[in-house]
């Protein structure tokens, strides 16, 4: 099977003419070329990540622009790698946990990150819930994690409140801290 390289895809597109961009086959070639030229990142075990066609959103393969707030899965993992390492190496006392709770936390935190959709656009101010408004008020008053917990602020609402003023990666940082504080290890 011939590997679709960026050069091969470009050659096919150019030879097919200017109308080729609307052709499904050409879109597929562009998608494969995108996958093959995407920089491989390395995991903790120094093994290269294998990018699949499903990793590339259809709208990106079709040439449509993506939101600057949107992160590809491997971009998110690259940004979170230092946080994950810190979590693993943090002492049990610092996490108010014990034993192997540190490593057991990682799958749960990963699910939580995607459930809260860090790439989602900010919610319009007039559509926020009472719970999120409460979280926003507490955050603006520099409330501690204990005070947030006593007020019944959930991690999800806390993250939504943070999203109004912070960048995505800072939301992840603070959201993870609160998540760990609540004992979700």
Swiss-Prot record:
Superkingdom of the source species: Eukaryota
Natural source organism: Hyaloperonospora arabidopsidis (strain Emoy2) (Downy mildew agent)
Keyword Metal-binding among record annotations: no
UniProt miscellaneous comment: ATR39 has 2 polymorphic alleles that are highly conserved among Hyaloperonospora arabidopsidis isolate. This conservation is in stark contrast with other characterized H.arabidopsidis effectors ATR1, ATR5 and ATR13, which are highly divergent. The presence of amino acids 'Glu-168' and 'Val-169' in ATR39-2 blocks recognition by host defense protein RPP39.
UniProt domain comment: The RxLR-dEER motif acts to carry the protein into the host cell cytoplasm through binding to cell surface phosphatidylinositol-3-phosphate.
Signal peptide feature range: 1-20
Keywords noted in UniProt: Secreted, Signal, Virulence
UniProt protein name: Avirulence protein ATR39-1
Residue runs in coiled coils: none
Function as written in the Swiss-Prot or TrEMBL entry: Secreted effector that acts as an elicitor of hypersensitive response (HR) specifically on plants carrying defense protein RPP39. The allele ATR39-1 is recognized by RPP39, whereas the ATR39-2 allele is not recognized.
Motif range (RxLR-dEER): 49-66
Secreted in keyword set: yes
One cellular-component annotation, GO: host cell
């Amino acid at each position: 099977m011939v590997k679709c390289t960026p050069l091969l895809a470009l050659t096919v597109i150019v030879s097919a003419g200017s109308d080729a961009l609307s052709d499904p086959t050409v879109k597929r070639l562009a998608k494969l070329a995108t996958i093959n030229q995407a920089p491989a990142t390395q995991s903790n075990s120094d093994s290269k990540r294998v990018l699949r066609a499903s990793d590339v959103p259809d709208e990106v393969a079709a040439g449509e622009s993506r939101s600057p707030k949107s992160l590809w899965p491997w971009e998110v993992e690259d940004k979170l790698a230092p946080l994950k390492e810190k979590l693993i190496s943090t002492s049990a006392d610092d996490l108010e946990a014990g034993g192997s709770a540190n490593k057991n936390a990682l799958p749960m935190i990963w699910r939580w990150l995607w459930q809260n959709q860090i790439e989602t656009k900010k919610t319009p101010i007039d559509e926020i819930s009472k719970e999120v408004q409460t979280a926003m008020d507490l955050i603006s008053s520099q409330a501690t994690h204990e005070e947030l917990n006593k007020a019944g602020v959930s991690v999800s609402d806390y993250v939504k409140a943070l999203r109004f003023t912070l960048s995505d990666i800072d939301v992840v940082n603070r959201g993870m801290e609160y998540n760990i504080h609540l004992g979700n290890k």
